[in-house]
């Protein structure tokens, strides 16, 4: 195999090499489709006058672009990737070449892009965001060149991956695939399709009101839609305006270990009729994934099966490090 970059534009020598290999492949296996999977989507110069011209010279059937999220090409890779997928889709609409996404399922045990550093499983929350970004842009198919040993069936007799966490990634992926309610709600937040069914208003500081404005942030600690909490105990009170049947609460948080940003260990939900006396309704552990040396991703905590009649809801947590939260969904539904 030969790996090359399509950045800043597809070099002429690379185009000629691809076409020569394609011709050879067709001579050996007539009638079969040809696929290439270059890296460099994050560093491509889409506005260069020759970018699309070089792409149009390629005589392949499929280009499966490495999304480079695992390789961490940017400090915050996903926000730019979302835009780049859209730009690449626009180009492919004028080409006779299928556009696939090659989603990187891994992160690095030590240094990034270092052959001495092992590839280990990424959190499924991050991978789902990659799937969503590619799907929204209209890719024709999503694949991954890293599955075995990264996404590991716990029932397999031959365990090749990182103990525990490769199984965790597999279980979460299969839960999403089978329509698990948490993963479908979380996916809807990534698609910006989750809404509050209950009419709610935040009580307290002005910046707390952003937690019920329906605006979700991206995987970037500088995004102004994140509400920032420092170390310590925090309580957020929500007025539902009237006595309401409370079924579930979903809280979104950011994970970015390099800036000491993470989820609280537990989330507590209390209810009250008068806003003075509160009763504990539920406690839920936040998700934990240890392979976080380099990655940025969004997580969520779902507190469901509440079955409470209440007007006021208090969400409480202890922050062992900085907690960034963008939205608290009360009785969330998918639009």
What are these regions (language model features)?
Residues 27, 52-59, 89-96, 132-136:
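Acidic (Asp/Glu)-rich catalytic clusters
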Residues 279-304:
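Extracellular carbohydrate recognition and processing domains
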Residues 67, 98-186:
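Substrate-binding cleft of secreted/luminal carbohydrate-active enzymes
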Residues 18-48, 65, 95-109, 144-147:
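Aromatic-lined carbohydrate-recognition surfaces of secreted/lumenal glycan-active proteins
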Residues 18-21, 40-55, 79-90, 127-130:
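Alpha-helical scaffolding within the catalytic cores
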Residues 1-12:
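Active-site groove signature of glycoside hydrolases
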Residues 220-280, 301-335:
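Aromatic, loop-rich ligand-recognition surfaces of beta-strand-rich domains
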Residues 187-219:
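Predominantly extracellular/luminal regions of secreted and cell-surface proteins
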């Amino acid at each position: 195999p030969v790996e090359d970059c399509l950045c800043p534009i597809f070099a002429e020598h690379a185009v000629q090499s691809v076409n020569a290999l394609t011709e050879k492949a067709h001579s050996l296996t007539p009638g079969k489709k040809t696929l290439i999977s270059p890296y460099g989507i994050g560093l491509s110069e889409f506005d260069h006058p020759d970018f699309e011209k070089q792409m149009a010279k390629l005589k392949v059937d499929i280009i499966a672009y490495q999304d480079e999220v695992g390789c961490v090409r940017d400090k915050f890779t996903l926000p730019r990737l979302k835009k780049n997928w859209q730009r690449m889709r626009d180009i492919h609409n004028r080409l006779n070449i299928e556009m696939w996404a090659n989603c990187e399922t891994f992160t690095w045990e030590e240094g990034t892009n270092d052959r001495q550093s092992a590839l280990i499983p990424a959190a499924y929350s991050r991978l789902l965001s990659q799937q969503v970004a590619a799907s929204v842009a209209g890719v024709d198919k999503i694949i991954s060149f890293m599955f075995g040993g990264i996404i590991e069936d716990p029932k397999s007799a031959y365990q090749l991956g990182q103990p525990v966490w490769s199984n965790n990634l597999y279980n979460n992926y299969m839960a999403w695939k089978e329509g698990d309610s948490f993963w479908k709600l979380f996916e809807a937040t990534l698609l910006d399709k989750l809404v509050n069914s209950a009419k709610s208003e935040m009580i307290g500081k002005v910046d707390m009101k952003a937690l019920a404005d329906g605006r979700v942030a991206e995987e970037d600690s500088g995004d102004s839609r994140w509400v920032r909490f420092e170390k310590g105990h925090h309580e957020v009170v929500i007025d539902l305006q009237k006595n309401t049947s409370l079924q579930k609460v979903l809280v979104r948080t950011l994970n970015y270990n390099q800036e000491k940003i993470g989820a609280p260990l537990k989330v507590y939900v209390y209810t009250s009729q008068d806003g003075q006396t509160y009763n504990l309704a539920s406690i839920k552990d936040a998700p934990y994934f240890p392979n976080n040396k380099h990655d940025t991703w969004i997580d969520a905590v779902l507190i469901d099966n509440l079955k409470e009649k209440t007007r006021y809801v208090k969400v409480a947590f202890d922050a062992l490090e900085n907690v960034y939260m963008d939205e608290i969904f009360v009785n969330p539904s998918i639009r």
